[in-house]
């Protein structure tokens, strides 16, 4: 099993629209593609990324196929309307907390 670690900051003034998009489109969309969310962290204080999130897929080939799909690209394009400083990394899932 592999894990997709992602982080980003929400654009100032876009918080309501961002959370609406995440709940109604992004989370259901990535699950439909075969990526299972495992956690999401919202940073209130400090200098780190505002959002840290993780999701798993069965194996690296599956994850890469998902990330290369047009459906994933469409979801990412919509996400980028609400966020900045997007970063991601694919790692082997350990079952423990993992950071980008």
Annotate each predicted stretch with a short phrase:
Residues 2-9:
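Active-site-flanking beta-strand signature of metal-NTP-handling nucleotidyl enzymes
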Residues 9-21:
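Short, surface-exposed ligand-recognition loops at beta-strand->loop->(often short) alpha-helix junctions
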């Amino acid at each position: 099993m592999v894990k997709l670690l992602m982080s980003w900051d929400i654009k100032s003034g876009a918080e309501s629209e961002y959370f609406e998009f995440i709940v109604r489109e992004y989370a259901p969309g990535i699950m439909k593609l075969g990526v299972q969310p495992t956690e999401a962290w919202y940073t209130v204080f400090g200098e780190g990324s505002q959002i840290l999130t993780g999701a798993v897929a069965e194996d690296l080939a599956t994850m890469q196929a998902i990330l290369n799909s047009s459906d994933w690209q469409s979801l990412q394009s919509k996400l980028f309307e609400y966020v900045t400083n997007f970063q991601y990394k694919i790692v082997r899932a350990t079952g423990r907390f993992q950071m980008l």
